[in-house]
Curated annotation (Swiss-Prot):
Gene3D superfamilies: VC0467-like (3.40.1740.10). InterPro entries: AlgH-like (IPR003774). HAMAP family: UPF0301. This is UPF0301 protein Bcep18194_A3962. NCBIfam families: PRK00228.1-1, PRK00228.1-2.
Amino acid sequence: MSKPSDRINLTNQFLIAMPNMADPTFSGTVVYLCDHSERGALGLVINRPTDIDLESLFNRIDLKLDIEPLLHIPVYFGGPVQTERGFVLHEPVEGASYNSSMSVEGGLEMTTSKDVLEAVATGTGPKRFLLTLGHAGWGAGQLEEEISRNGWLTVAADPRIVFDTPAEERFEAALGLLGVSSSMLSGEAGHA
């Protein structure tokens, strides 16, 4: 059994799916890890836009959104857990406090309460955010096992990839943080 000090904490890291990812849900994805502990991990897929845009989602939850640049921003598939629930990944907003927010150590915030969407609708919320439906979750030791089987690469997260890079370029951009491209990856694991 490893000591707690031996544990690697992957909070505020990107998980990048390897080509041999067997689960089609995660094939080709980049996941921002919001929390990683001995109890498990929680993250949001950041590169799978859905056909739903903010205007449609806000209409569904009876919020008026009149800020033109926001209307057609896509809502993302955040993962297969709680797909009916919204998760907002955003930069901290000075002086703002939302009902259900989690500060990610060294990084962003994730909020699940409607008040952050109300703030977005009125223009007082986070300026840089990504809204997902659902999240990715792993039980105790599950993510570590997947990483040990070469299912994921990990790298320190860069908010510019989350907020400034087009969705279809995020996978390659995240790999670029490691100095590699998808053409350099093999789906086969081996030992030297």
